[in-house]
Structures are given as structure tokens and as C-alpha cells.
């Protein structure tokens, strides 16, 4: 019990009070009788080594008491002479910072019963079996402690209680302050992206119909139908998840980058006006087009201008939410257009002989039959935007009242529905795949040269200039 008391006092004594006693000038063996704490500290306390010089001093002290025959006498005397001539008060003490008090040395907690047992047993075992690894020794000591019964533990418990009372006397204002664990987890308070980011033209405020479409405006004009009035591809989409473009641009020919149409103005009610003029239709992924059945007409009608003149509607609403024919080509099926019930579909069967189908699209607007932006008829294919109310698809066509639809329409039937019963917008439908071949070769009725019927080999198409109303 006396040995345990000595050990515990050494463990409890603060570093400041321990060092001058251990490092007093003189030979190392003279440190032993200098109090119980010093003797205990010198007898092999391996658990708390100091910095380099202090460790040497403790080692010398340990050698002086325990194994005198390890070093010759001349070596021990030389070491003692060197150590006695050095002022050890100049050596900075190892101070563990406790809170903000950097000047005061760290006060250790009083040992509990297991610590009393483990320290005494560790010293005894380390002297007897120096080859034992410290970690294995600790494990074994813990196992042995759990196997002890209450009568075996009682002396250690009493000693721990005595140490606790002594610690309370020595440090009356002591308060246990455990070191705060550094929180390695990343801060989770990262702010979510705002609903309509202007840089991406996002429309997350428009709820699940758009599935928070983040359409990149940082690549404008790459085959864009509305950026500089070149509707090379039918205009963009109405919604889609923020996936990167996966469809290869097979129909892209010569899109000029013209970032003068930046649709970054937020609409009223927190719903941004998405300018899809800078969105290439060929970049829409397959999942977007296969999930287009959940389509709310009332959400989209707010973007239409009040007048039904398709010259304006084609330039605005077709740019706002258009579904082009290349969209269904990329999708591969026509299941993404759902037919709303109770809407009359004026089906215009193509008149004409030997594959010259001229589909005439009529508009019952308040101004009468609307006049699309006419332009001089040339031998190349020109395009205007036939504005559908829901999908606003800018179908490539000849810009005349009689529209010759070119030969790259997809096989799926198109249903363009009038969302309002007043019939402000044009409504038309194509024949199903059972009524017409996959690609109908349509030639321009005007005198023209030979045209190629592949959309990747158009020769210098003539474009209608589309402008905002």
C-alpha cells in the first residue's frame, strides 16, 4: 500500500512541483530519499516521459536507483557532473493548455481505483518482464481487473478515495475540464441553391412540372434557335432535370455563339421566365422526353402573350417552351405527348399527289387567319415557328401560309392541342405512323434545285428573324 501511495502521489503532483525535486543539482542517487514522490518517480514511471533532456534526466535517475550496474561509475559521475552544472529552470516545462490558462501547469484528475491498480501492477510487471509490450500489458491489466471480486478491489477503492480527498485539499478550486473534441464532421449548414438561379436559368420555383430545370445559359447560341434569329434547330424544352446533355448533336451544323439573349429576368410571383432560346434541342436527354406526360397547361399559359398573333407568339412562346421535331427523334417514341380530353383536333390530311403533302395550318385567332412572317421564297428550306399553346413547337416549315413540312418529321404522331377554348392559337396534328410513311419526301413547290432530304445535309437554310414582342 505504501508503494501505491507513492505512485499515486507522483502521478498526482503537478509538473511544476515535480520537476524541481527531480532535477535538483547533485548526483542522481541522491534524489531518492528526497520525499516519497521523488522516490516513486525515480523507480520506473515509464508512462509519462518529458521532452528530450527531461527524459534523459529521468532515465539517469532510474538507472541510479534500479540498475546501478548498467553503466560504469565513470559514466554516471560524468553525467551527474554535467547535469548538476546546468540550470534546469531554463528548460521550458511541458504545459498542457487547459482552457485559457497557459501559465499554470496542468492538474491531473485524481486516479480512480482501476488507475491505482493498473499503475502499481504495471510498474511491477514492467520491472519483472521488460519485454512486455505496453499495449498488451494494458489489455491484460484490464482483464485482470474485471476478474477481481469486491474484496480484492477494496484496497484500491479505498486508496482512490483517499487520493480524491487529498486532491480536493490540494486543489480546492479544481474543476474537471475535458478537452473538447475537434469535430471532424463538415458543417452541414450549407445553404441550398436558390430556386431560380440566374446563372443557370433555373426554375425550381416552378414546382414538380419542371423538376427544377437548370438549363445552362453559359453556352448560348450553340445551335440555338433563338439567339441570333437562326432557328436551325426547333426550339427548346419546357422542363427537365439538371442532367448534363447526353444526346449527341447529330444535326448541329453551324451555330454562332451570340449571347445577346440572356433570359435572366425573374417573372412575377417568384417564377422565372426561362429563355430557352439558348438551349439546343439535341441536348435534351432521353429521360426528359420520356417523362413529359405530367404537363400542366395552366402553368405554361402564363408565359404566353395576351394577343394570339402567331408572329409574336412564335418568337416568344416558341422560345419559351418549345418542343421541336428533333426532340421526338431523340426520344424515339411519342408517349411523351398526352392528349387532353375534350379538345377538338382539326386533322388536316395532306392533299397533293405523289408524296407532295402540303399541310395547311389555320389559326382561328381574333384577328382572323394569322399571317406568318413572309419572306421571299427561295430554293432552300426556311423555318418559322408554329406556336403551339402547350408545347410551342417550332416545326421547320416553309414560311408561307401553305407550309411544306420537310422530310425529317419523326414517326410519332404529333398532337398540338389548343389549351384555351377561344382558339387563340393554332392547333394541328399529324397523321399517325400507320397512315404515313416514316419519312415523307416533300419538295418545295417553288422552282428549286435538288434538295437533300437528310437533315444533316441542308444547304444553307434560310432563317426567319424572330424577335421579342
UniProtKB/Swiss-Prot annotation:
What segments bear the compositional bias annotation Polar residues?
Answer: 443-469
Looking up SUPFAM superfamilies in the UniProt record yields: HMG-box (SSF47095)
Q: List the Gene3D superfamilies hit by this protein, alphabetically.
A: High mobility group box domain (1.10.30.10)
- Any idea what this protein is called? Transcription factor SOX-10
Query: What is annotated about its quaternary structure and interactions?
Result: Monomer. Interacts with ARMCX3 at the mitochondrial outer membrane surface. Interacts with PAX3.
Q: Which intervals of the chain are annotated as region Dimerization (DIM)?
A: 65-105
Which residues mediate DNA binding here? 107-175
| PROSITE patterns cross-referenced by the UniProt entry | HMG_BOX_2 (PS50118)
What's one Pfam family here? Answer: Sox_N
Stretch list, region Transactivation domain (TAM): 231-313
Keyword field contains Mitochondrion? yes
Please give the residue ranges the record annotates as the region Disordered: 1-70, 163-203, 215-278, 357-378, 436-469
Where are the compositionally biased (Gly residues) regions? 33-44
Q: Which UniProt keywords apply?
A: Activator, Cytoplasm, DNA-binding, Membrane, Mitochondrion, Mitochondrion outer membrane, Nucleus, Phosphoprotein, Transcription, Transcription regulation
**Intracellular or extracellular location(s):** Cytoplasm; Nucleus; Mitochondrion outer membrane
Q: Which organism is it from?
A: Sus scrofa
What does this protein do, in the record's words? Transcription factor that plays a central role in developing and mature glia. Specifically activates expression of myelin genes, during oligodendrocyte (OL) maturation, such as DUSP15 and MYRF, thereby playing a central role in oligodendrocyte maturation and CNS myelination. Once induced, MYRF cooperates with SOX10 to implement the myelination program. Transcriptional activator of MITF, acting synergistically with PAX3. Transcriptional activator of MBP, via binding to the gene promoter.
- A GO-annotated cellular component: mitochondrial outer membrane
Gene Ontology biological-process entries: central nervous system myelination; enteric nervous system development; morphogenesis of an epithelium; negative regulation of transcription by RNA polymerase II; neural crest cell migration; oligodendrocyte development; oligodendrocyte differentiation; peripheral nervous system development
Q: Which PANTHER family match?
A: SOX100B, TRANSCRIPTION FACTOR SOX-10
Q: How does it sit in the membrane?
A: Peripheral membrane protein
- UniProt comment concerning the protein's domains: The transactivation domains TAM and TAC (for transactivation domain in the middle and at the C-terminus, respectively) are required to contact transcriptional coactivators and basal transcriptional machinery components and thereby induce gene transactivation.
Bias class Low complexity marks the residues at 23-32
- Gene Ontology MF, one: DNA binding
Show the segment(s) annotated as Transactivation domain (TAC). 356-469
* Ranges of compositional bias, category Basic and acidic residues: 163-176, 257-274
On this chain, the residues bearing Phosphoserine are: 24
Amino acid at each position: 500500500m505504501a508503494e501505491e501511495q507513492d505512485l499515486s502521489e507522483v502521478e498526482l503532483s503537478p509538473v511544476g512541483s515535480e520537476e524541481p525535486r527531480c532535477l535538483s543539482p547533485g548526483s542522481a542517487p541522491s534524489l531518492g530519499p528526497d520525499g516519497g514522490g521523488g522516490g516513486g518517480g525515480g523507480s520506473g514511471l515509464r508512462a509519462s516521459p518529458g521532452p528530450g533532456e527531461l527524459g534523459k534526466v529521468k532515465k539517469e535517475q532510474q538507472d541510479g536507483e534500479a540498475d546501478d550496474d548498467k553503466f560504469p561509475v565513470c559514466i554516471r559521475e560524468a553525467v551527474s557532473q554535467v547535469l548538476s552544472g546546468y540550470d534546469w529552470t531554463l528548460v521550458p516545462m511541458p504545459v498542457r493548455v487547459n482552457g485559457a490558462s497557459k501559465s499554470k501547469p496542468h492538474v491531473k484528475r485524481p486516479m480512480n481505483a482501476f488507475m491505482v491498480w493498473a499503475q502499481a501492477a504495471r510498474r511491477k510487471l514492467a520491472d519483472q518482464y521488460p519485454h512486455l509490450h505496453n499495449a498488451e500489458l494494458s489489455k491484460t491489466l484490464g482483464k485482470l481487473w474485471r476478474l477481481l471480486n469486491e474484496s480484492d478491489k477494496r484496497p484500491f477503492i479505498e486508496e482512490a478515495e483517499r487520493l480524491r480527498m487529498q486532491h480536493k485539499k490540494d486543489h480546492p478550486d479544481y474543476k474537471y475540464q475535458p478537452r473538447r473534441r475537434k469535430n471532424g464532421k463538415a458543417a452541414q449548414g450549407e445553404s441550398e441553391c436558390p430556386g431560380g438561379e440566374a446563372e443557370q436559368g433555373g426554375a425550381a420555383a416552378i414546382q414538380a412540372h419542371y423538376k427544377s430545370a437548370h438549363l445552362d445559359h453559359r453556352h448560348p447560341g450553340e445551335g440555338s434557335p433563338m439567339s441570333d434569329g437562326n432557328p436551325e434547330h426547333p426550339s427548346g424544352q419546357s422542363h427537365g432535370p439538371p442532367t448534363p446533355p447526353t444526346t449527341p448533336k447529330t444535326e448541329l451544323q453551324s451555330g454562332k455563339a451570340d449571347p445577346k439573349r440572356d433570359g435572366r429576368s425573374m417573372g412575377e410571383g417568384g417564377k422565372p421566365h426561362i429563355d430557352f432560346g439558348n438551349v439546343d434541342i439535341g441536348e435534351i436527354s432521353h429521360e426528359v422526353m420520356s417523362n413529359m406526360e405530367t404537363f400542366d397547361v395552366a402553368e405554361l399559359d402564363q408565359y404566353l402573350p395576351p394577343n394570339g398573333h402567331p408572329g409574336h407568339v412564335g418568337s416568344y412562346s416558341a422560345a419559351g417552351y418549345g418542343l421541336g421535331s428533333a426532340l421526338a427523334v431523340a426520344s424515339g417514341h411519342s408517349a411523351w405527348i398526352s392528349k387532353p380530353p375534350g379538345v377538338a383536333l382539326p386533322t388536316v390530311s395532306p392533299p397533293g399527289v405523289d408524296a407532295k403533302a402540303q399541310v395547311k395550318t389555320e389559326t382561328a385567332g381574333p384577328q382572323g387567319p394569322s399571317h406568318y412572317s413572309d419572306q421571299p421564297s427561295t430554293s432552300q428550306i426556311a423555318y418559322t415557328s408554329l406556336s403551339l399553346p402547350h408545347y410551342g413547337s417550332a416545326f421547320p416549315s416553309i414560311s408561307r401560309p401553305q407550309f411544306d413540312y420537310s422530310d425529317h418529321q419523326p414517326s410519332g404522331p404529333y398532337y398540338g392541342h389548343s389549351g384555351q377554348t377561344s382558339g387563340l392559337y393554332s392547333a394541328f396534328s399529324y397523321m399517325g405512323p400507320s397512315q404515313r410513311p416514316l419519312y415523307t419526301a416533300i419538295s418545295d413547290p417553288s422552282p428549286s434545285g435538288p434538295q437533300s432530304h437528310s437533315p444533316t445535309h441542308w444547304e444553307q437554310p434560310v432563317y426567319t428573324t424572330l424577335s421579342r414582342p
